[in-house]
């Protein structure tokens, strides 16, 4: 993911949490903040130490990033997204992560209909 497509700073995370809305399932919570005039979406990841050791946390983050890279064309731009991984995400395969993120993205209405890459 390109640098300008990432949310890194604490104040940016806080703004998404405070001003955006959230949608969740058992494995992930997605906070969404619409941003006018921004041509692309930005993603911030939060994986707590409760999930596991550094290797596990980094693996979960890699899987989430891969999902967003694969579905870049289907995801609505002009928004900031913060994805929080919950404990069950640590033991999931990529196919399970993809299904779970697809589900929560559909609930949040951030994926444009009929544009699904690689099922």
UniProtKB/Swiss-Prot annotation:
Underlying gene: rnpA
Keyword Cell division in annotation: no
E.C. no: 3.1.26.5
Organism per entry: Halalkalibacterium halodurans (strain ATCC BAA-125 / DSM 18197 / FERM 7344 / JCM 9153 / C-125) (Bacillus halodurans)
Gene Ontology cellular component annotations, sorted alphabetically: ribonuclease P complex
Catalytic activity: Endonucleolytic cleavage of RNA, removing 5'-extranucleotides from tRNA precursor
Pfam families linked: Ribonuclease_P
Name of the protein: Ribonuclease P protein component
GO MF, any single term: 3'-tRNA processing endoribonuclease activity
């Amino acid at each position: 993911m390109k640098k300008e497509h990432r949310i890194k700073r604490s104040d940016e995370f806080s703004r998404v949490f405070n001003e955006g809305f959230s949608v969740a399932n058992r494995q992930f919570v997605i906070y969404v903040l619409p941003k006018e005039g921004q041509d692309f979406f930005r993603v911030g990841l939060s994986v707590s130490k409760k999930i596991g050791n550094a290797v596990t946390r980094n693996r979960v983050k890699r899987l989430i990033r891969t999902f967003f890279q694969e579905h870049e064309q289907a995801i609505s731009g002009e928004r900031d997204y913060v994805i929080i991984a919950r404990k069950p995400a640590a033991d999931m395969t990529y196919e399970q992560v993809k299904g779970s993120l697809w589900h929560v993205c559909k609930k949040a209405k951030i994926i444009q209909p009929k544009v699904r890459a690689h099922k």
